Each structure stands twice: as structure tokens, then as C-alpha cells.
Amino acid sequence: MDIFIDYETICINCQEKGYSFGYGMKTIEYRGFKILDLPQKNLNGATVYFEYENKPVLLKSTENQHYSEFGKFSMINARVGKSGLISRFTYSFSFPRKKPDEKQKPKIIEYVDVYRFKDKPYFFIFYTFRNLTGKPIKNFNFYQFYDFDIYGEDSYSNDIARYDSKSDIIYQFDNEKGLDMSLFAGIGSSSKNKPNNFECNTPQDIFIFKNNQVSLRNYAEKGPCDCAVALQWIRPIFKHNDLISFPIMMIAGLGNKNFFENVKDARKDLEIHQKSVIRAVDNISREKIDPKLQKLNFSKREWCK
């Protein structure tokens, strides 16, 4: 495998059963070199912000379960393909019923499809959302946050983060190794899904929803220092029963030239696989609640008995 991913799980026994606490990534390596190394939880994947019934809702790190005054976010279905390279997760964010006679709780379904490859310097995560609240959702914001550590935690202070406006890729590399020799890691989307905003910053200062601000600040470069990167997409209106999708690619490379060649190849492949993801999302089995997940409800005490 060109890219090795170590997922965050609750315990070894849970992993053997085929379940995990979502799809959170603990470490990522490219050809034996670390590009992600024990990141902060809020800088490790997807975050969603939106307005429902004129109230703001924020879900950080959507690979993990959340409880809040606005509702419950939990994984209801998890499947892995025979090859072990394709994983499909389904999550539900349920709002409290407003009326006793409501037959179903208003909810948003999130489908997460992870595509890995044996000999390619990239992998994909497709995030798809379905609005089943019965009402339009306003100002739906989808974010990707990553706290890359090029060559691992021991070298984190040498990183430089940049946003490339030509390819709409945000990436990090090691300043000591230089552009031509360094390991690179970055994220982006399809050619038709240009991010609205971006940010290169330190993990401590990167935008994390302070002072009611919901937009990234378009800082195009940071470093050399400990860096983190983020991209943001905005959908003003998310209508009832509509689907919205955010295809994400994570790319690695050795040297600037190799990295951007890999970006081109990854984007072509991403757009091909996106068609199969839509078919998978429409499969009714994706929303079938796994009784084991529902019963255990991700309680570590119960799960590990």
C-alpha cells in the first residue's frame, strides 16, 4: 500500500468485530513516512455548521458521535467491502420532535464513503448529506480541517502550509527538505467543487468558530512552524429531501512536481468514482439501522464487556 491509514478505534475486540468509533484517522503514512500523526480531534476531518429553525448547529469531527441540545448525531450503519479498500458509513443527526403526533424525528442523514487504493498516492472520502427535516436548511457549511505533521511529530515545527489557487489544493511540506525533495500532503475536491474559503494557520489559531464567525479567513500561506489547513464549502439553501455531496481527495507526493502530478491523476479518478458513490447512497440498505450499533450506542463501558 502506498498509503497506510491507522484508524482510531475503541478497543482491539471492537475492531475484530468490524466496528469502530467511526472513521477517525490516527496516523497516515505515505511510503513509510508519516503525514498525519495523532492530530487534534477537531482538526481531523469534517465539520458541519448550518442553521435550522433560525438556530445555529455546529458538529465538529463528524466521524464521532455527538449529543447536544439540538439533537443526537450517531453512526447507524457500517460496512466494509470484501477487498477492505472501500468502507461505507451512515450517520444520522436527529432533531427532537416538536409535536407529539410527529411520526418521525426530523433528521439529516450523512453518508461517508472511503475509497483506498493499493498502489496510488491518494485516497478519497465522499461526504453526502440528505435533508429529511421537512424544512429547508439555511447556510449549510462543510469544512475539512487537517493538522498534518510532515515526517511525524518530531518534524512538525518545520512545516509550511500553502493554498494553490490554480488547482484549489491546500497542502503542507517540510521546509528543511525543500520544495524539490520534501514529502507533501494536501486535500482538495473535484474540478466542479471549488472551495468558497480556505485557511493556512497554526493548529491553535486556525478558525474554530469563535465570536460567531463561520468563514475561513483565506490565509494562503503559513510557516515554517506547526501548521494546519482547512477548506470550506457553502450551500445557501439545503432543501428537504435534497442530496448534497462533497468529494474529498487526500494526496501525497515526493517533491513539488510529483505532488502536483498526483493531484491531476487523483482528480480524474475522483470524478470517475463519484458516480458509483451516488448509486451506493441511493441503496436503501444504507439507512438500515444496525441493531448492534443501536443497542450499544457507542458506550465504551458496554462495548468492551
Q: What is the predicted role of each segment?
A:
Residues M1-C11, Q15-Y19, G24-E29, P39-N42, ...:
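Polysaccharide-binding surfaces and accessory modules of carbohydrate-active proteins
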Residues I35-S68:
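N-terminal targeting leaders for non-cytosolic proteins
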Residues P236-L254:
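Short Pro-Gly-centered flexible turn/kink motifs
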Residues S157-I160, F246, D269-I272, S276:
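Aromatic sugar-binding interfaces of carbohydrate-active proteins
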Residues V112-Y115, Q232-I237:
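Beta-strand-rich interaction surfaces with strong enrichment in secreted/lumenal proteins
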Residues F259, K264-K305:
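Non-catalytic terminal regions with compositionally biased, polar/charged low complexity
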Residues V214-C225:
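Short, basic/aromatic beta-hairpin or loop at an interaction surface
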